[in-house]
């Protein structure tokens, strides 16, 4: 593990998803799941989110669209909360969901809107 990339990823992950959520995920990790948590933190958050060529807001919008396209609604809800935390507006969420609905289909759009309304 690249410790510097892990620490950078940990900071990014906490900034988007909340320190409470991340610390709980890491604390609940056991010998079986700890390597996965480390991989997610180092590569998703340290490598991908740590690349400064895209700002966090743009990266978050991309994630919302991609995760919706994959129909991973539990993960989508988590990233929706993160998007709102970093300043993506309700109007921007609505625009993303219109795009998702057109390209991914009505059922995916319906599910995303249902989650977003909560």
Where are these regions (language model features)?
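Acidic, glycine/proline-rich low-complexity segments that act as flexible tails and inter-domain linkers
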Residues: 1-57, 85, 110-118
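Residues at alpha-helix boundaries and the short loops/turns that link adjacent helices
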Residues: 16-19, 73, 87, 103
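A short structural micro-motif
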Residues: 32, 46, 68, 86, ...
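Short alpha-helical scaffolding segments that buttress acidic/His motifs in well-ordered protein cores
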Residues: 40-44, 61-68, 96-101, 112
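Mid-chain, well-packed structural core segment of small domains
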Residues: 61-94
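C-terminal binding/interaction regions
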Residues: 88-92, 96-118
């Amino acid at each position: 593990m690249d410790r510097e990339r892990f620490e950078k990823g940990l900071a990014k992950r906490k900034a988007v998803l909340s320190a409470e959520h991340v610390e709980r995920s890491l604390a609940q990790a056991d010998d079986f799941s700890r390597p996965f948590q480390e991989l997610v933190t180092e590569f998703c958050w340290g490598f991908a989110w740590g690349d400064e060529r895209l700002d966090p807001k743009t990266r978050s919008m991309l994630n919302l669209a991609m995760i919706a396209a994959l129909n991973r609604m539990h993960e989508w809800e988590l990233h929706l909360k993160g998007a709102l935390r970093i300043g993506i507006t309700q109007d921007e969420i609505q625009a993303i969901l219109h795009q998702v609905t057109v390209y991914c289909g009505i059922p995916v759009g319906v599910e995303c809107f249902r989650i977003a309304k909560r």
